[in-house]
UniProtKB/Swiss-Prot annotation:
Protein name: Nucleoprotein
Subunit structure: Homomultimerizes to form the nucleocapsid. Binds to viral genomic RNA. Interacts with glycoprotein G2. Interacts with protein Z; this interaction probably directs the encapsidated genome to budding sites. Interacts with protein L; this interaction does not interfere with Z-L interaction. Interacts with host IKBKE (via Protein kinase domain); the interaction inhibits IKBKE kinase activity.
Gene for this chain: N
GO molecular function, one term: RNA binding
Binding site for Zn(2+): 400, 507, 510, 530
Length: 570
């Protein structure tokens, strides 16, 4: 957006804020309550999985089901949600001229949205070429002078469109909106930040939003005071955005809700009795400033955004509430009737769940009975079978270890609380994505006990042997031999998505956002590294197929996690 357009757009926003201030409310406490409910009740391993799915270049019905299921879980946990409601606008508060204007604007908005969802501009690919063909296509387009051409909001730099290939596209409706409570919860959990720090950082961003649209330059400056804002990413394609992405727009929306008395549009609450009054006030601003619905595909201007959200959401908070249960689009849920008197009521579904989980102090080390159980369990390993090993963390301070035998599917998988918290947090951001709080309940002493119990002179396969060797040597297991398969990174992880799709339920600890540096600068999100799933994908890479025997755990959950009642060790 050019500077002149941005200034004009913000002028519209400010004018709408002033005119609609009577419909705004202070919802900071409600947003924070919902964020706390999500922190305590949401499965963040599934959040991380959905974030991974949103990075795939093509997604199918199974991916959509995962997204919808997670959205429903979020909806069940929060109180701020919109309720399905059919709105029929009639002559009354709104004049017949008002209704004609609204009907025309809704029709234009419908055409714009649908056209934007199916771009036909040159250089945009919506088909099913392979990755190799797409790369060849990119080179050819550059050769003929199209490399720097059209880059709409739904294309990557190389012209690839990340597309949903689903049987029923209507199931995509209302599944991608951002929610402040969800943004806050994800920043806390996945950014491993204190809730108060996140609230303060977003509040400062919201204060900037009272005067201008914050941009990435503003964000960089704020990040110097609030490091957690560094988790926010540069602008993403609209087709790839979801409520679980750390976009600037999501953060700004969250910040707007934390400003008491800011008259932010994001805090408007719609009821059946005030909808027409809100629309009447919006039309007043439209006429005074000459606001309009643009024919140009792309982001909605403030008037378009307000109109769409008001007509879609029914009863609730059109900007910030969960709307995953809303069916249809704005033009489906709001109609204009100059003579009819149709009304439909919907009862709100009030649901709330608060599940708290916290680690409690327990005796350190394995008990005698646990040691005996471990030795018996280790007998399930075949000392002569092919065996993979992988670790996450540093060899002197590992946090996750996995041992896997593909012939019979047996695996050992456990975790360890780190001693170097600072290094752990760095590794979490750039490798494994584990939250330190999730490791407080793991069984201490298991690393040494398991390595000590491995069969003598055993041979282990690994992808990179240096760290594994250091770990084994530190436990005086120099008798164990290592085979470093030394695959290229891309080759080793070519079945990564298929393995995660099939076996993600085996490990729910990798909840954070993991980023790695690009060769040409900047950073990108990647799938977290899980020691167990890495072993599975390495085996799949070696045999050339993700079809592997069903993995079966050797260790019981009681061995991996402390489950007994707390007691004081004297």
């Amino acid at each position: 957006m050019s500077n002149s357009k941005e200034v004009k757009s913000f002028l519209w926003t400010q004018s709408l804020r002033r005119e609609l201030s009577g419909y705004c409310s202070n919802i900071k406490i409600q947003v924070i309550k919902d964020a706390q409910a999500l922190l305590h009740g949401l499965d963040f391993s599934e959040v991380a999985n959905v974030q991974r799915l949103m990075r795939k270049e093509k997604r199918d019905d199974s991916d959509l089901k995962r997204l919808r299921d997670l959205n429903q879980a979020v909806n069940n946990l929060v109180e701020l949600k919109s309720v399905q409601q059919k709105n029929v606008l009639r002559v009354g508060t709104l004049t017949s001229d008002d209704l004609l204007v609204l009907a025309a604007d809704l029709d234009r908005l419908k055409a714009k949205v649908i056209r934007g969802e199916r771009p036909l501009a040159a250089g945009v690919y919506m088909g099913n070429l392979t990755a190799q063909q797409l790369e060849q296509r990119r080179v050819l387009l550059q050769m003929v002078g199209m490399g720097g051409g059209f880059r709409a909001g739904n294309t990557l730099g190389d012209g690839i469109v990340r597309v949903w290939d689903v049987r029923n596209p209507e199931l995509l409706n209302n599944q991608f909106g951002t929610m402040p409570s969800l943004t806050i919860a994800c920043m806390c959990k996945q950014g491993q930040a204190d809730l108060n720090d996140v609230i303060q950082s977003l509040s400062d961003l919201g204060l900037v939003y009272t005067a201008k649209y914050p941009n990435m330059s503003d964000l960089d400056k704020l990040s110097q005071t609030h490091p957690i804002l560094g988790i926010i990413e540069p602008k993403k394609s609209a087709i790839n955005i979801s409520g679980y992405n750390f976009s600037l727009s999501a953060a700004v929306k969250a910040g707007a809700c934390l400003i008491d008395g800011g008259n932010m549009l994001e805090t408007i609450k719609v009821t059946k009795s005030n909808l027409e009054g809100i629309l009447k006030a919006a039309l007043k601003v439209k006429r005074s400033l000459g606001m309009f619905v643009s024919d140009t595909p792309g982001e909605r201007n403030p008037y378009e955004n307000l109109l769409y959200k008001l007509c879609l959401s029914g009863e609730g908070w059109p900007y910030i509430a969960s709307r995953t249960s809303i069916v249809g689009r704005a033009w489906d849920n709001t109609t204009v009737d100059l003579s009819g008197d149709v009304q439909q009521n919907a009862k709100p579904d009030k649901g709330n769940s608060n599940r708290l989980a916290q680690a409690q102090g327990m005796p350190a080390g394995l008990t005698y009975s646990q040691t005996m159980e471990l030795k018996d369990s280790m007998l399930q390993l075949d000392p002569n079978a092919k065996t993979w090993i992988d670790i996450e963390g540093r060899p002197e301070d590992p946090v996750e270890i996995a041992i896997y035998q593909p012939n019979n599917g047996q695996y050992i998988h456990f975790y360890r609380e780190p001693t170097d918290i600072k290094q752990f947090k760095q590794d979490s951001k750039h490798s494994h994505g584990i939250d330190i709080q999730d490791l407080f309940s793991v069984q201490p002493g298991l690393t040494s006990a398991v390595i000590e119990s491995l069969p003598k002179n055993m041979v282990l396969s690994c992808q990179g042997a240096d760290d594994i060797r250091k770990l084994l040597d530190s436990q005086n297991r120099r008798d164990i031999k290592l085979i470093d398969v030394s695959m290229q990174k891309d080759d080793a992880r070519k079945f990564e998505d298929k393995i995660w799709d099939e076996y993600k339920h085996l490990c729910r600890m990798h909840t954070g956002i993991v980023t790695q540096k690009k060769k040409r600068g900047g950073k990108e999100e990647v799938t977290p590294h899980c020691a167990l799933l890495d072993c599975l994908m390495f085996e799949a890479a070696v045999i050339g197929s993700p079809q592997i025997p069903t993995p079966r755990p050797v260790l019981s959950r009681d061995l991996v996690f402390r489950t007994g009642p707390p007691r004081v060790v004297l």
